């Protein structure tokens, strides 16, 4: 044997002890106050969410299958986006994304969901402003074109010209169909192709849970009339229960995208009062 002459009499690391020092001790004091103050620790918790903070900073790992998405953590609002001031209520919007996670849209299949999302990157708040669930009659001969027309109507009413489309599986040819439908309308749009490689459950959990657990996920009240809240209640990382999660997947995809910068309409335009008190 190769290691016969170098055999160890005792197993490697026999009798070792694990040293665990969480960033905050049992009394709530920082373990290293000169590096991590109370304010800095609170900021970290707000950024990564309670689950990741517990695992990485408190050394208390939470099994992913125990994770859930509680709709009680959502913060609802009624205000519409004010493009002139680039605001939703008191919040200044810095970016937006329109994201489409497509499917056939037929009954007994995955839902096709399109999400409009705004962001306030100063406060790290995310606003799910609208979720469009697309359905197609079983008799429809061209289900993808039918959905493209509905999405284009959605974009036109909100004065949007850019959309990100997930191209995994059925969506691989959808950007071309979307451009063709827009061309026939005379609409000028930009389509961004998105290919996801991570599992759906990881995408949903890692994108939504940190925002939800820290009170940074805002949802327009109209979305209470969609299947989204039922999706949250029935969702499990293991997929147990067979509940649809297509709206959640679309929101996760939108959160992961680089937002399009948003600026107030007419920003930089100043008014001047002319001095007309002169004689010729």
Regions found by a protein language model. Give the residues of each.
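Mg2+-dependent endonuclease catalytic cores in nucleic-acid-processing enzymes, primarily RNase H-like
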Residues: 2-31, 39-43, 60, 64, ...
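Short, glycine/acidic-enriched loop or turn micro-motifs at the edges of active sites
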Residues: 102-104, 169
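ATPase catalytic-site recognition across NTP-hydrolyzing enzymes
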Residues: 27-102
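Acidic, metal-ligating active-site segments
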Residues: 108-120
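Well-ordered alpha-helical segments embedded in enzymatic catalytic cores
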Residues: 113, 146-150, 249
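Conserved RecA-like P-loop NTPase helicase motor core
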Residues: 222, 245-249
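A short catalytic or substrate-binding loop motif that flags glycine-/basic-rich loops and adjacent residues
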Residues: 90-92, 105-110, 244
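Acidic two-metal-ion nuclease catalytic site recognized across multiple nuclease folds
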Residues: 254-280
């Amino acid at each position: 044997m190769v290691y016969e002459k170098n055999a160890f009499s005792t197993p490697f690391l026999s009798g070792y002890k694990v040293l665990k020092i969480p960033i905050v001790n049992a009394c709530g004091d920082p373990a290293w106050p000169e590096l991590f103050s109370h304010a800095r620790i609170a900021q970290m918790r707000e950024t990564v969410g309670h689950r990741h903070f517990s695992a990485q900073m408190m050394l208390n790992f939470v099994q992913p299958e125990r994770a859930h998405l509680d709709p009680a953590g959502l913060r609802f609002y009624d205000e519409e986006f004010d493009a002139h001031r680039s605001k939703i209520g008191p919040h200044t919007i810095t970016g937006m994304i329109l994201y489409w996670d497509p499917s056939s849209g037929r009954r007994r299949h995955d839902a096709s969901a399109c999400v409009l999302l705004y962001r306030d990157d100063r406060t790290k708040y995310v606003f799910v402003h609208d979720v469009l669930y697309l359905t197609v009659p079983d008799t429809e001969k061209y289900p993808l074109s039918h959905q493209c027309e509905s999405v284009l109507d959605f974009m036109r009413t909100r004065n949007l010209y850019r959309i990100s489309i997930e191209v995994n599986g059925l969506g691989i040819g959808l950007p071309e169909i979307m451009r063709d439908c827009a061309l026939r309308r005379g609409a000028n749009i930009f389509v961004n192709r998105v290919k996801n490689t991570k599992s759906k459950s990881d995408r949903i959990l890692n994108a939504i849970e940190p925002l939800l657990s820290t009170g940074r996920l805002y949802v327009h009240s109209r979305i209470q009339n969609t299947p989204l809240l039922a999706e949250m209640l029935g969702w499990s990382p293991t997929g147990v229960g067979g509940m649809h999660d297509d709206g959640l997947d679309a929101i996760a995809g939108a959160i992961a995208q680089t937002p399009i910068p948003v600026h107030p309409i007419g920003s930089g335009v100043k008014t001047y009062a002319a001095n007309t008190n002169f004689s010729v």
